[in-house]
């Protein structure tokens, strides 16, 4: 797998797609999320569900995270140099990457090399990646101090949501699909309504 991964990186077989984020209030695109797909040399597409778990197991996910981050920073840098308006493009970061030595320094350097504002590349962490402990707390504080905005992805899919909300400085809350699936029944509506209210009271934006 590692040999195939190295070859794929060299040939830029990992393709970054941008999924738009819309504001319900303004009906405008307010940003995007970077998604990655593996387009093999022979043209076949490999879904993230197939390769991400393998890369997480082998530790290759750290290199893929940085690859995607570099691509997004490059996109934002090119738009700035072309005089175009930039909107934030969020990038997912795995738990393995958070624990990787010098991760923050490496990511800060990439942002600075591309001459872009930190706010243009928010970092998304899943509940699992952001499971609260002292080490995670310190690392996340360093990321915020460096200038990054943090989004909690898949909120409501795990068991540590409230602890993470209470202890970690997230800017945006992204509701998990499992919550949205119950929006048509009364209890589901109440859960979503109060979750949004809680997030707003903490000064956080909410995405679904």
Give a label for each model feature.
Residues 52-53, 62, 141, 189:
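Conserved long alpha-helical elements within nucleotide-processing catalytic cores of c-di-GMP signaling
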């Amino acid at each position: 797998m590692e040999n195939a991964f190295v070859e794929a990186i060299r040939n830029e077989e990992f393709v970054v797609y941008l999924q738009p984020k819309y504001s319900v209030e303004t009906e405008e695109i307010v940003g995007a999320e970077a998604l990655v797909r593996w387009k093999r040399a022979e043209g076949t597409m490999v879904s993230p569900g197939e390769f991400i778990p393998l890369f997480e197991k082998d530790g290759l996910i750290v290199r893929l995270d940085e690859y995607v981050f570099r691509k997004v920073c490059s996109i934002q840098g090119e738009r700035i140099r072309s005089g175009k308006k930039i909107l934030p493009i969020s990038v997912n970061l795995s738990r393995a990457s958070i624990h990787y030595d010098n991760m923050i320094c490496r990511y800060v350097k990439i942002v600075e090399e591309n001459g872009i504002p930190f706010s243009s590349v928010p970092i998304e962490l899943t509940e699992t990646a952001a499971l609260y402990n002292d080490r995670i707390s310190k690392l996340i504080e360093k990321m915020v101090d460096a200038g990054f905005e943090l989004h909690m992805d898949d909120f409501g899919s795990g068991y540590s949501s409230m602890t993470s909300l209470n202890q970690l400085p997230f800017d945006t809350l992204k509701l998990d699909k499992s919550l949205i699936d119950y929006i048509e029944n009364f209890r589901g509506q109440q859960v979503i309504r109060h979750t949004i209210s809680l997030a707003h009271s903490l000064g956080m934006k909410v995405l679904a």
